[in-house]
């Protein structure tokens, strides 16, 4: 089965948007932009998005698609004299999962 190009672009945009725990703004923004064409979009104080499809009328079945917008995240605590970074963990996850993984480092301006 060939995946629809629109769905592939959405998945790529969501995967590429930085979204460490507590800093999911860019992921929510991407989801909101894509969902705007589907129907009404509401957001609560926890940054949860609720998308109500325009076509959901009458006695049609309703389904829920649920997912997290956050990902594994770290904050740079300090930089050692040799250039190595010391991190503080955001959220709760297994630290061993990070060993030899690539990370994206951004400054306070998001650059």
Spans of model-derived segments:
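N-terminal hydrophobic/helix-forming segments and targeting peptides
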Residues: 1-111
